[in-house]
């Protein structure tokens, strides 16, 4: 007897965004906050454990300052090994400038904070040595400082413990726009969307064929998770048929006089219960930049795994949304439509669903306005 199983949480998550799946957000400050909590709580527990004994308290403070200062100096010495490598590339990477060699090697994101911590540690050491010179001037502490400054940083570097984890690398790339997806999103915006979207409503108004048929005067951009874009959308969903093009938009760009840009209008027919048909017209196209990700995943010289491609397509959508949300020229002229790319009948259903949902929202807003109702944001 077949069992009726409820969908699991993972299955429900994969149904989000028209079957595309969840779109993750930027990483926050949780890791830094957790690290701070661990550091402060550990230091507090150590201090509470020795606070009754003055000698141990002084030892704890002195040792913490000593290790902190030795770590700072050790990092500077470790970076000298990086300088030795950069010297080999001084003329090709740094235009022969020593200043560039040292600047790129010894630059810290939080240099001010590091300097302040090192100075504070040095002051503590000086004070402790002044107060209890006989206790802390032993050679044991000098050896500890030397090992932690000269040996440990180099050892950690050589065995690979200083290598960034995949999480840290991903976070760094996202923050500094170094992902493939970030470059593709910016290129798609500057090379296409920023040029055509500001003129979209004018192009619709110029079209005698479609000016009254197109109800949603936006460019609907299909974003399949598979990254594969069909040459004709009808191949992805037979119900989405090409109906014609809007008037051509001519823009001189990149040395090409009157380069032509044009948008395709697609028609969807959905049957009613009484047998008649509802017609919907959309300005519809794929985000062609996604095909680059698909091609990279298929090319031997540009290895991009399926898992990494799935990651990059989400980054592309997120970055593109961030860019367009901040663009005054493009506001109100686009609709991003993430889809799974696997269902042959999903495009028509998704677009009609978005169209009807928008109409219901407008009708609800008009009804509230007529009755003096103010909905909370």
From Swiss-Prot:
Q: What is this protein called?
A: Stimulator of interferon genes protein 7
Listed as disulfide-bonded, the cysteine pairs are none
TM helices/strands, residue ranges: 30-50, 57-77, 106-126, 141-161
Membrane topology, record value: Multi-pass membrane protein
Q: Which GO terms describe its molecular function?
A: 2',3'-cyclic GMP-AMP binding; 3',3'-cyclic GMP-AMP binding; cyclic-di-GMP binding
Please verify whether the record's keywords include Secreted. Answer: no
- Function, please? Facilitator of innate immune signaling that acts as a sensor of second messenger signals produced by cyclic GMP-AMP synthase-like receptors (cGLRs) and promotes the production of type I interferon. Innate immune response is triggered in response to nucleotides from viruses and bacteria delivered to the cytoplasm.
Keyword Membrane among UniProt keywords: yes
Which species expresses this protein natively? Stylophora pistillata (Smooth cauliflower coral)
Q: Which family does it belong to?
A: Belongs to the STING family.
What are the alphabetically sorted keywords of the record? Immunity, Innate immunity, Membrane, Transmembrane, Transmembrane helix
Location comes to: Membrane
């Amino acid at each position: 007897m077949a069992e009726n199983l409820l969908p699991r949480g993972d299955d429900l998550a994969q149904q989000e965004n028209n079957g595309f799946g969840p779109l993750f957000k930027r990483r926050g400050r949780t890791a830094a906050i957790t690290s701070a909590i661990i550091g402060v709580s550990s230091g507090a527990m150590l201090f509470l454990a020795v606070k009754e004994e003055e000698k141990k308290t002084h030892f704890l403070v002195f040792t913490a300052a000593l290790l902190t200062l030795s770590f700072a100096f050790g990092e500077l010495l470790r970076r000298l090994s990086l300088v030795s490598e950069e010297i080999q590339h001084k003329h090709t990477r740094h235009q022969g400038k020593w200043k560039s060699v040292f600047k790129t090697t010894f630059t810290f994101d939080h240099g001010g904070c590091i300097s302040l911590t090192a100075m504070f540690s040095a002051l503590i050491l000086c004070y402790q040595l002044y107060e209890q010179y006989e206790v802390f001037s032993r050679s044991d502490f000098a050896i500890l400082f030397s090992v932690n400054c000269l040996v440990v940083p180099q050892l950690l570097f050589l065995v690979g413990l200083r290598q960034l984890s995949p999480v840290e690398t991903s976070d760094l790339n996202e923050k500094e726009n170094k992902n493939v997806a970030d470059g593709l999103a910016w290129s798609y915006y500057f090379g296409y969307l920023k040029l055509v979207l500001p003129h979209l409503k004018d192009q619709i108004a110029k079209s005698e064929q479609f000016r009254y048929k197109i109800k949603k005067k936006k460019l609907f951009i299909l974003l399949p998770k598979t990254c594969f874009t069909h040459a004709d959308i009808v191949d992805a969903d037979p119900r989405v048929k090409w109906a014609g093009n809007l008037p051509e938009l001519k823009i001189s760009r990149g040395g090409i006089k009157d380069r032509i840009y044009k948008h395709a209008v697609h028609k969807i027919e959905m049957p009613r219960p009484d047998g008649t048909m509802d017609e919907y017209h959309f300005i519809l196209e794929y985000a062609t930049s996604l095909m680059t990700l698909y091609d990279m995943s298929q090319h031997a010289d540009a290895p991009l795994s399926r898992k990494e491609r799935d990651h990059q397509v989400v980054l592309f959508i997120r970055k593109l949304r961030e860019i367009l949300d901040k663009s005054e020229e493009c506001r109100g002229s686009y609709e991003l439509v993430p889809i799974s790319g696997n269902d042959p009948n999903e495009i028509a259903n998704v677009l009609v669903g978005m169209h009807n949902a928008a109409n219901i929202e407008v009708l609800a807003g008009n009804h509230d306005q007529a009755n003096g109702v103010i909905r909370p944001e």
